[in-house]
């Protein structure tokens, strides 16, 4: 099998990575936007009892 590309895994990885970014970017952005307030709420809830404990 003649190896046309010296690193075929790299190009494959890049193609898969770019396609994943393009496909998942809206989902990731919406997930980050929807789930970003909840960790802050959890953090504030967790950090509130600290002075009393």
Curated annotation (Swiss-Prot):
Q: What is its main location?
A: mitochondrion
List the GO cellular component terms. Answer: mitochondrial membrane; proton-transporting ATP synthase complex
**PANTHER family hit by this protein:** ATP SYNTHASE PROTEIN 8
Q: What does this protein do?
A: Subunit 8, of the mitochondrial membrane ATP synthase complex (F(1)F(0) ATP synthase or Complex V) that produces ATP from ADP in the presence of a proton gradient across the membrane which is generated by electron transport complexes of the respiratory chain. ATP synthase complex consist of a soluble F(1) head domain - the catalytic core - and a membrane F(1) domain - the membrane proton channel. These two domains are linked by a central stalk rotating inside the F(1) region and a stationary peripheral stalk.
Q: State which residue ranges cross the membrane.
A: 8-24
Tell me the name of the encoding gene: MT-ATP8
Where along the sequence do coiled-coil regions lie?
A: none
Where does the protein end up?
A: Mitochondrion membrane
Q: From the Swiss-Prot or TrEMBL record, give the protein name.
A: ATP synthase F(0) complex subunit 8
Q: Which organism is it from?
A: Alligator mississippiensis
| Oligomer status and interactors | Component of the ATP synthase complex composed at least of ATP5F1A/subunit alpha, ATP5F1B/subunit beta, ATP5MC1/subunit c (homooctomer), MT-ATP6/subunit a, MT-ATP8/subunit 8, ATP5ME/subunit e, ATP5MF/subunit f, ATP5MG/subunit g, ATP5MK/subunit k, ATP5MJ/subunit j, ATP5F1C/subunit gamma, ATP5F1D/subunit delta, ATP5F1E/subunit epsilon, ATP5PF/subunit F6, ATP5PB/subunit b, ATP5PD/subunit d, ATP5PO/subunit OSCP.
Q: Which GO terms describe its molecular function?
A: proton transmembrane transporter activity
Give membrane topology per the record. Answer: Single-pass membrane protein
Q: Give the domain of life.
A: Eukaryota
As for family, the record states: Belongs to the ATPase protein 8 family.
Q: Which UniProt keywords apply?
A: ATP synthesis, CF(0), Hydrogen ion transport, Ion transport, Membrane, Mitochondrion, Transmembrane, Transmembrane helix, Transport
Q: Does the keyword Protease apply?
A: no
**Which GO annotations describe the biological process of this protein?**
proton motive force-driven ATP synthesis
